Design a protein with these regions (language model features):
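C-terminal motif of bacterial Sec signal peptides marking the signal peptidase cleavage site
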Residues: 24-27
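Aromatic- and acidic-residue-enriched carbohydrate-binding clefts of CAZyme catalytic domains
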Residues: 57-61, 97-144, 176-213
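An active-site-proximal structural segment forming one wall of the substrate-binding cleft
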Residues: 71-74, 80-84, 88-89, 138-151, ...
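Active-site-proximal helices and loops of the catalytic beta/alpha 8
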Residues: 38-60, 76-82, 93, 98-121, ...
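Soluble non-cytosolic domains of exported or imported proteins
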Residues: 68-75, 133, 137, 213-217, ...
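Bacterial signal peptide processing site
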Residues: 29-31
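N-terminal carbohydrate-binding accessory modules
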Residues: 34-67, 73-83, 175-194
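Bacterial N-terminal signal peptides that target proteins for export
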Residues: 2-14
Length: 500
């Protein structure tokens, strides 16, 4: 015990030294570009040696969605993810999944076997590991490595449906829930027709996928074992896919359900057969509650954070139209408190399904990322696109398991990630430049982010709270000056400046 205490004390002292040194460096007027600073593996391990503290702060930091990356690929790239300033990763679903034709690994293609990315969204048993991402042992090893870097692991789970081909569901799943007759809601094979009808929306078949009876106590017991095993392996949170299709306690009940108690149980407020969700108070939990008719998005925040899907759509349009009007940018377009929102400029659904974001360029995505990450509230989620040509849906370079493209390491992405860390607790203020094509985001009196969508250079002359002096922006090395409270400088076309 004495050795453990001494080791822990030394770790705390090292972290304190690192943090104090970083603060002293940041307070100086440096002429170097911080985003290009080389950080050793040893420094990263010391700086992030308290993952419990890190998990509590996921809500205020940034998440990287490592979409379709295998566990081993994630593990190999954790040093780069940490250097890029991400404090959490979100994996694709890690459960046993549909295998289909020849266990294909194509993300999407027109070949005979077609695309398979959506197969891990069709669970056939609630146990860790699938042919696409890796084994339970590999998942556990990845989580252990992530903990060394202070990176939280969030796992995507999809409880309310199963394979579109029911014979794929493994016998252990069927037996655990009490047989085939108890697997689905009474309404579970009927397609949703009226999306504003909460009974249909929370019990009906969606997208060809039968609706699992998530209120069946036997299912809940079985699924709790999976959740707690995932936590035991090192998961620090969960994203609940299609969360708005799982009923809230006061929603209409299915004929096969006694209570709509899924959310109280799987957020740690209620036990199932004596089993509680492990470490519930430490987990970051959020639900995919896409906004629409009678989505009840605010009501879900009693249990989990929720997605700000309308804001993401509005922001994409604003960037594509080069109109960063303050009314568009400031309005979350959501009834919930903004500290309960998960934000994105692109998600795997907006990229991979109808492709409404797939034609956006790398810079357009970085501009959107800069805006949501520079803001005071919301938890920004960065979608890692597959490798290949930009502004292209499924370029055909990557397959399932591969690393995505390198945009997560772009200096503009890294700079705003670190800006967010430095600005926790500071208020936000928005202004436009000479036109609505330029946006200036101020965080208290500590920092400024400028996004320039113009085809030409923008001359900045703006009153700020920053101390007088010369500043080098952390993204592109642009020189700025503050004199008598006026920030001046020039930002070239299609650039982002991060100043603090």
């Amino acid at each position: 015990m004495k050795k453990l205490f001494t080791k822990r004390l030394l770790s705390i002292l090292l972290v304190a030294t690192f943090v104090l040194t970083s603060l002293l460096i940041a307070s100086c007027k440096s002429t170097s570009n911080v985003s290009t600073t080389q950080i050793s593996k040893e420094e990263l391990l010391v700086a992030n040696s308290d993952p419990a503290l890190n998990r509590q702060k996921v809500q205020n930091r940034t998440i990287m969605q490592v979409w379709c990356w295998s566990f081993n690929t994630i593990k190999e790239n954790l040093p780069d993810i940490a250097k890029a300033g991400f404090k959490a990763i979100q994996t694709s679903p890690i459960n046993a999944c549909r295998e289909g034709d020849e266990k294909g690994m194509a993300l999407m293609s027109n070949t005979r076997t077609g695309g398979k990315w959506y197969y891990h969204y069709q669970p056939i048993a609630w146990k860790i590991g699938n042919y696409q991402l890796g084994t339970r042992e590999e998942f556990k090893a990845m989580c252990e490595e992530a903990e060394k870097y202070g990176i939280s692991v969030i796992v995507d789970v999809l409880t309310n449906h199963t394979s579109s081909y029911l014979p794929d569901v493994l016998p252990e799943f069927i037996e655990a829930v009490g047989g085939k007759d108890k697997l689905l809601h009474a309404n579970g094979q009927n397609p949703i027709r009226n999306w504003s009808n909460r009974y249909e929306g929370t019990t009906g078949k969606m997208g060809g996928l039968p609706d699992v009876n998530t209120e069946n106590p036997l299912f809940q017991d079985y699924f709790m074992d999976y959740m707690n095993d995932t936590i035991l392996c090192g998961a620090d949170g969960f994203r609940f896919d299609t969360a708005k299709h799982i009923g809230l306690p006061d929603d209409p009940r299915d004929d096969y359900s006694k209570d709509n108690d899924f959310w109280p149980i799987f957020t740690g407020k209620k036990a199932i057969n004596g089993k509680m969700l492990s470490r519930a108070d430490e987990l970051f939990l959020y639900g995919e509650v896409l906004q629409g008719s009678n989505a009840r998005e605010k009501d879900y925040t009693e249990f989990v954070s929720v997605t700000a899907s309308n804001y993401g759509g509005n922001l994409r349009r604003a960037i594509q139209q080069k109109n960063l009007g303050l009314g568009i940018i400031e309005d979350w377009n959501h009834p919930a408190n903004p500290d309960k929102l998960v934000t994105w400029i692109e998600s795997h659904d907006t990229y991979a399904n109808q492709g409404e974001s797939a034609k956006m360029t790398h810079f357009q995505l970085r501009a959107g990322w800069a805006i949501i990450t520079a803001r005071q509230y919301g938890t920004p989620l960065f979608f890692s696109r597959p490798q290949g040509a930009e502004a292209t849906q499924f370029p055909g370079v990557s397959q399932i398991g591969d690393k995505g493209n390198d945009e997560f390491m772009h200096p503009e992405v890294v700079a705003v990630n670190k800006f967010r860390d430095a600005m926790v607790g500071e208020g936000e203020k928005f202004s436009n430049g000479t036109t609505r094509q330029t946006l200036i985001i101020e965080r208290g009196n500590k920092g400024v982010v400028i996004v320039n969508l113009k085809d030409g250079t923008e001359q900045i002359k703006h009153k700020v709270g920053l101390a007088d002096g010369e500043y080098i922006d952390h993204a592109n090395g642009i020189k700025f000056k503050v004199q008598d409270g006026i920030l001046t400088g020039k930002i070239k076309a299609s650039k982002i400046a991060v100043i603090y």
